[in-house]
Amino acid sequence: MATIQVKAEVSGSVWQITTKVGQKIEAGDTLMIIESMKMEIPVIAEHAGTIDRFMVDEKAAISEGQVVAVLSR
């Protein structure tokens, strides 16, 4: 089973996680929303799969390029 790391495209804080561990997702689905410079930026899945785990919690500060979730295909 292949795993896919989902990385944040911007630094900021995790405003809301919109999916759950174990949930099946499609490419283009929003996994979470990052607040950066008073803007809400969605983290979008580039591949379909199942959410294995989140590497961050809501309200956590994150950096650009940080792994925020792991998917399995």
Q: Where in this protein do the model-derived segments appear?
A:
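A structural signal for short beta-strand/turn segments enriched in small hydrophobics and glycine
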Residues: 22-31, 59-68
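Juxtamembrane helix-loop transition sites at the ends of transmembrane segments
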Residues: 45, 56-59
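Short histidine-centered loop motifs in beta-beta connectors
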Residues: 16-20, 24, 53-56
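Short beta-strand-turn/beta-hairpin segments enriched in glycine/proline and small hydrophobics
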Residues: 1-13, 30-46, 73
